[in-house]
Structure formats: structure tokens, C-alpha cells
């Protein structure tokens, strides 16, 4: 009996049947999991510029697309709502001299990307109504009397923001965000007082007429 077992094993080993059986049982569907040669191209017409793919990509292979060339749908809404005519329609650029950073164009833009086009201040911004001229920041770039930051002297170290006890200094990005109106719809009683004091309300009435 033992002789027959040894001979049977030699036959299997010599013919490679064991390996063949393993391949046929476990590796039959291997081709189904093969890596595709190329990634499916991005459908720019369907992209809303949310940036989620950029956040989750483990190899940082995806980058935010160019604003004017691919994402903007050229709807012109931002041009229509700008109270100071600061947005030029031919290339959807923003005139930094006219832009008051009111954020109205951001509220109306169906694809929330124009916010990146709003001109940002070159230095942190001091909120004068909060600043008490404490002088804790020893940086020569800060004018304590006028509560302003000299862009030529500021090194953007942001140490002034960390030291300010009243949180009266904002980064350029924080400053832009603070200008955009946010309404708590649960707390709003629809008194419309905000409309009465809004400085650009007259411009909207002029556009509607």
C-alpha cells in the first residue's frame, strides 16, 4: 500500500497537477481584479468643484482645476449681483479697486468657487472695533494708533494673531469669510431691519428698476 502511495505522489508531482488544481480553484477570476491601464477621465461637465476627491486621494494625484477654464459655467450670475460692478464679464475677473469684499457674488454663485477670486488683503487685518491698542505685539509693522498693519514691514509670521487677547486680528482668509453674511434661519424673525440698513440696498433697487 505504501508503495502505491509513493508512486501516486510522484505522478502528481511530476505532472504539476497540484499546482494546476490550485490555480483552477483559486485563481480562476484573477483577471477580473486586474488594474485598469488608465483612470476613467474626469467629466468636467458634471464636476461641481467640491474638492472631495482631492481630500481623499491617498497619493495626492488630483489637483483643483483652473477656475476660469474648467469649473466656471459662465452663467454670469456673479456679474449681475455685484453691487459695485467689480466683476468683468469677458473673463470673470474681479477689479480689486472696486471690490468691497461684500461676498454677495459668493452667495449667488451656483458653483462655490468665485470666493477664491475675491482679492485678499496682503496682511492680517485688524478689526478696529475690537482692538484696544494694547501693544502686546512688539512687531513694528503694526500701527497701534491707526490700528493698521504696514504691508511693507509685515512678514506674515501671524504671531500678532496668537498674542491678541481680544481676537481682533484675522488672517486674510478669515477676514474674507467674516465679510460674507451668514443668516441663522432658525433665529431670524424676518423683521427685514437688515435690509433697511444694508449699504448696497439702493444699488439693488436701481438694478431692478
UniProtKB/Swiss-Prot annotation:
Q: Which Pfam families match?
A: Fer4, Fer4_10
> What are the residue boundaries of the 4Fe-4S ferredoxin-type domain, all occurrences included?
38-67, 63-92, 90-119, 122-151, 145-174, 179-209
Any single GO molecular-function term of the entry would be:
4 iron, 4 sulfur cluster binding
Tell me which SUPFAM superfamilies the record gives: 4Fe-4S ferredoxins, alpha-helical ferredoxin
Q: For binding [4Fe-4S] cluster, which residues are annotated in this chain's numbering? A: 47, 50, 53, 57, 72, 75, 78, 82, 99, 102, 105, 109, 154, 157, 160, 164, 188, 191, 194, 198
Which keywords does UniProt give here?
4Fe-4S, Electron transport, Iron, Iron-sulfur, Metal-binding, Repeat, Transport
What InterPro entries does this protein's entry cite? Answer: 4Fe4S_Fe-S-bd, 4Fe4S_Fe_S_CS, Fe-S_Ferredoxin
- The question of whether Endoplasmic reticulum is a record keyword is answered with no
Q: What is this protein called?
A: Uncharacterized polyferredoxin-like protein MJ0934
Amino acid at each position: 500500500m505504501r508503495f502505491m502511495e509513493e508512486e501516486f505522489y510522484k505522478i502528481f508531482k511530476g505532472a504539476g497537477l497540484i499546482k494546476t488544481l490550485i490555480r483552477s480553484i483559486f485563481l480562476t477570476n484573477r483577471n477580473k481584479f486586474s488594474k485598469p491601464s488608465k483612470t476613467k477621465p474626469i467629466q468636467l461637465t458634471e464636476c461641481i468643484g467640491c474638492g472631495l476627491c482631492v481630500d481623499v486621494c491617498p497619493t495626492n494625484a488630483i489637483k483643483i482645476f483652473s477656475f476660469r477654464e474648467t469649473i466656471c459655467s459662465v452663467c454670469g450670475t456673479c456679474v449681475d449681483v455685484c453691487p459695485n460692478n467689480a466683476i468683468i464679464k469677458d473673463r470673470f475677473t474681479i477689479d480689486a479697486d472696486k471690490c468691497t469684499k461684500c461676498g454677495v457674488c459668493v452667495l449667488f454663485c451656483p458653483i462655490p468657487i468665485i470666493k477664491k477670486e475675491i482679492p485678499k488683503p496682503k496682511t492680517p487685518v485688524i478689526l478696529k472695533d475690537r482692538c484696544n491698542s494694547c501693544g502686546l505685539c512688539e512687531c513694528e509693522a503694526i500701527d497701534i494708533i491707526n490700528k493698521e498693519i504696514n504691508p511693507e514691514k509685515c512678514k506674515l509670521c501671524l504671531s500678532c494673531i496668537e498674542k491678541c487677547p481680544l481676537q481682533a486680528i484675522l488672517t486674510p482668509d478669515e477676514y474674507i469669510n467674516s465679510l460674507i453674511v451668514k443668516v441663522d434661519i432658525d433665529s431670524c424673525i424676518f423683521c427685514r431691519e437688515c435690509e433697511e440698513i444694508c449699504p448696497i440696498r439702493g444699488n439693488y433697487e436701481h438694478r431692478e428698476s
